[in-house]
Amino acid sequence: MSLNSLDLPGKPEDTRVVVAMSGGVDSSVVAGILKREGYDVVGVTLQLYDHGAAVHRAGSCCAGQDIEDARRVSESLGIPHYVLDYEARFREAVIDPFANSYVSGETPIPCVSCNQTVKFADLLQTARDLGADALATGHYIRSRANGAHRALYRPVDTDRDQSYFLFATTQEQIDYLRFPLGHLPKAQVREIAEEMGLTVAKKQDSQDICFVPQGKYSDIISKLKPEAANPGDIVHIDGRTLGRHDGIVHYTVGQRRGIGVATGEPLYVVHLDAANARVIVGPREALETHKVFLRDINWLGDAPISDLPEGGMEVFAKVRSTRPPRPAVLRHADGQTWVELVDGESGIAPGQACVLYSDESNTARVFGGGFIGRSEREPQAEEMLRRLVANTASASAA
């Protein structure tokens, strides 16, 4: 049997596709394209978090106005549209872990957790319950057949590449998901929206983190976890106490501005010692990292990660969403998985993701990745930090 444009058997009219509609231009165009191709399209919008009934905030996702936009687009396309209340689930699976992670001194990525749990787990099950053959989203990433399964690849438009946030997508989810925009540049998507007469054609893009008002992480974390705002010392990596801070929630590894001390030398946050409420700062070279150890790994390679050769596997690693993939070596031994960064990176923080690729091009395959549990700096800085933390632990025990 021949395959349709979604690589599924059967004619489009016999293929039901649930489209995850956020109310933005991307998911709206996905619904429009699939409807135009003759698929049996069903739109579903998740109500995840709202700062006020039907109050739109630029950069939010799935708030009141966004839900109304998704409804209007669905109506104009002539497809059924359902709104599912996932606020409690979103709080449990995304917001609370986000706050807990910050309290422990990490720099979490809530969008990964949202995709991993709510969007690609709960919503996927909803799509199956609706009898859908696939779940389509407006993410900028590509998938294509790889033997009996499907593999992920970077999109054509690398400026919109969302593979960093989708590394935790499981093989089962990848096989069921479809990403119709992966081969299109964003500008063309807007043009298609205009051609279709969609009301959201000129709508501003979301900024992903829907539950953080005006981008102030500290506000919501302080409300959920007041202990994150406990004051403490700002300490130089060489052991000098330089000043005080109003809570580690206001800092992140790699930060330079707004540290709150003036010493005549450029200082950066190099470590958040959550156990002792300390912000540890140092020179830029103290941020340089060449090795990161991963946890909660989602490996999407063809062979098990435990079968990596003794010398490791040459890959390209991305340690921040805004940075390009850089040469690295992936290693696995004695139950540990780590990545050696050939050129080193600065500002790497626990809780961030390290995503692995076959190469640095926009056709690169996504091999998955993991969350950064810890990292190792240049030997001198690493030893200074270990000594500082160890001495504090010994003093506390005494």
From Swiss-Prot:
This is tRNA-specific 2-thiouridylase MnmA. Catalyzes the 2-thiolation of uridine at the wobble position (U34) of tRNA, leading to the formation of s(2)U34. It is found in: Cytoplasm. The record marks H139, Q352 as: Interaction with tRNA. Residues 160-162 are annotated as: Interaction with tRNA. ATP binds at A20, M21, S22, G23, G24, V25, D26, S27, L46, G138. It comes from Brucella anthropi (strain ATCC 49188 / DSM 6882 / CCUG 24695 / JCM 21032 / LMG 3331 / NBRC 15819 / NCTC 12168 / Alc 37). One of its GO terms (biological process) is tRNA wobble position uridine thiolation. The keyword Secreted does not apply. Belongs to the MnmA/TRMU family. GO terms for cellular component: cytoplasm. The active site is at C114, C210. NCBIfam families: PRK00143.1, trmU. It comes from the Bacteria. Keywords: ATP-binding, Cytoplasm, Disulfide bond, Nucleotide-binding, RNA-binding, Transferase, tRNA processing, tRNA-binding. Disulfide bonds join C114-C210. Coiled coil: none annotated. InterPro entries: MnmA-like, MnmA-like_C, MnmA-like_central, MnmA-like_central_sf, Rossmann-like_a/b/a_fold. The keyword Transmembrane does not apply. GO terms for molecular function: ATP binding; tRNA binding; tRNA-uridine 2-sulfurtransferase activity. Gene3D superfamilies: Adenine nucleotide alpha hydrolases-like domains, HUPs, Translation factors. It catalyses: S-sulfanyl-L-cysteinyl-[protein] + uridine(34) in tRNA + AH2 + ATP = 2-thiouridine(34) in tRNA + L-cysteinyl-[protein] + A + AMP + diphosphate + H(+). The lineage of its organism: Bacteria, Pseudomonadati, Pseudomonadota, Alphaproteobacteria, Hyphomicrobiales. HAMAP family: tRNA_thiouridyl_MnmA.
